[in-house]
């Protein structure tokens, strides 16, 4: 029981410490929400819509599998 209480207090303390010492230069949360709202209003500005994929026959990355339509086999999109 004591160990459980100590663990709860420790977690609460560490959480409070993290929020108290977090670097919030330039009001990061406000900028984050502002950018997300702008991207919802203008989907073309969204970074998520920029797809950097390779066409068939182009060199590709085996780890990222960055081919548009097929698979990356021996560093070439199929």
Curated annotation (Swiss-Prot):
Q: Which InterPro entries match?
A: Conotoxin (IPR004214), Conotoxin_d-typ_CS (IPR012322)
* Propeptide residue intervals: 23-49
Where is it mostly found? Answer: secreted
Question: GO MF annotations for this entry?
Answer: sodium channel inhibitor activity; toxin activity
Superkingdom, natural source: Eukaryota
- Leader sequence segment: 1-22
Report the Pfam families cross-referenced here. Conotoxin
Name its cellular compartments: Secreted
Cysteines paired by S-S bonds: 53-68, 60-72, 67-77
Alphabetized, the UniProt keywords read: Cleavage on pair of basic residues, Disulfide bond, Ion channel impairing toxin, Knottin, Neurotoxin, Secreted, Signal, Toxin, Voltage-gated sodium channel impairing toxin
| Gene Ontology CC terms | extracellular region
Tissue-specificity statement: Expressed by the venom duct.
What does the UniProt function comment say about this protein? Delta-conotoxins bind to site 6 of voltage-gated sodium channels (Nav) and inhibit the inactivation process.
Description of its domains: The presence of a 'disulfide through disulfide knot' structurally defines this protein as a knottin.
Record family assignment: Belongs to the conotoxin O1 superfamily.
Name of the molecule in the record: Delta-conotoxin-like TxMKLT1-0111
**To which species is this protein native?**
Conus textile
């Amino acid at each position: 029981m004591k160990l459980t209480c100590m663990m709860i207090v420790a977690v609460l303390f560490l959480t409070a410490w993290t929020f108290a010492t977090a670097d919030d230069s330039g009001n990061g949360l406000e900028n984050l929400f502002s950018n997300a709202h702008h991207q919802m209003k203008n989907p073309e500005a969204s970074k998520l819509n920029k797809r950097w994929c390779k066409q068939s026959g182009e060199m590709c990355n085996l780890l990222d599998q960055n081919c548009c339509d097929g698979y990356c086999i021996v560093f070439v999109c199929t």
